[in-house]
């Protein structure tokens, strides 16, 4: 009888564990299970982040390399010069797993990566503008006479506009469930899980382009 009871207890424990894993992986917390791709049709979160970060960086380089300029500046509406991937993924996971037809995010397939891309660009818009800037230079000629020279340069300003997770929740008309998921994923107690999931792309991990940078223009 004891052996039977023990066996039943073990089976129940296994069932409970499996049920908990299924529940968690099917909720917004499933994003923490997406560190590894389960099959050839899926990719891990880090792989998706690397791909999309590369696309973002390519856009910055495209602007810098094709828009004619003499000097280049980069500005951000919040003085942040990197993608806050933790926030992007929290919005993504809450949106996908919390909607009426919620799907698990424990693995990322093509359709989900496309949605993640959409959210990433919505939260990290890139624009640019150019303007002339004239500088007056006072020098002396070979005879010691003062001379004034004006130099007009074209300044390229790359503009980064970031949206917060709260702004995205409003834009996407989050339901109560989605907002609850978002708040849970932003709880400080999960910082270690985010760091483990994102690795070098964790919150604040590296600038994509330094502010007030200059480069030789290659555009025409």
Describe every region a protein language model picked out:
Residues 1-219:
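Membrane-proximal envelope biogenesis segments
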């Amino acid at each position: 009888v004891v052996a039977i009871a023990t066996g039943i207890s073990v089976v129940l424990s296994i069932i409970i564990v499996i049920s908990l894993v299924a529940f968690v992986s099917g909720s917004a917390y499933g994003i923490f299970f997406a560190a590894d791709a389960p099959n050839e049709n899926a990719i891990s979160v880090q792989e998706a982040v690397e791909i999309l970060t590369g696309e973002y960086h390519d856009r910055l380089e495209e602007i810098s390399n094709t828009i004619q300029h003499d000097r280049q500046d980069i500005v951000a509406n919040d003085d942040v010069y990197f993608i806050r991937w933790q926030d992007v993924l929290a919005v993504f996971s809450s949106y996908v797993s919390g909607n009426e037809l919620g799907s698990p995010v424990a693995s990322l397939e093509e359709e989900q990566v496309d949605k993640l891309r959409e959210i990433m660009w919505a939260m990290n818009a890139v624009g640019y503008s150019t303007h002339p800037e004239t500088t007056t230079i006072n020098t002396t000629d070979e005879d010691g006479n003062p001379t004034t020279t004006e130099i007009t340069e074209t300044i390229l300003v790359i503009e980064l506009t970031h949206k917060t997770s709260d702004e995205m929740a409003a834009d996407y008309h989050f339901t109560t469930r989605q907002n609850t998921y978002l708040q849970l994923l932003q709880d400080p107690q999960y910082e270690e899980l985010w760091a483990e999931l994102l690795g070098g792309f964790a919150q604040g991990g590296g600038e994509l382009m330094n502010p007030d940078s200059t480069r030789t223009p290659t555009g025409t």
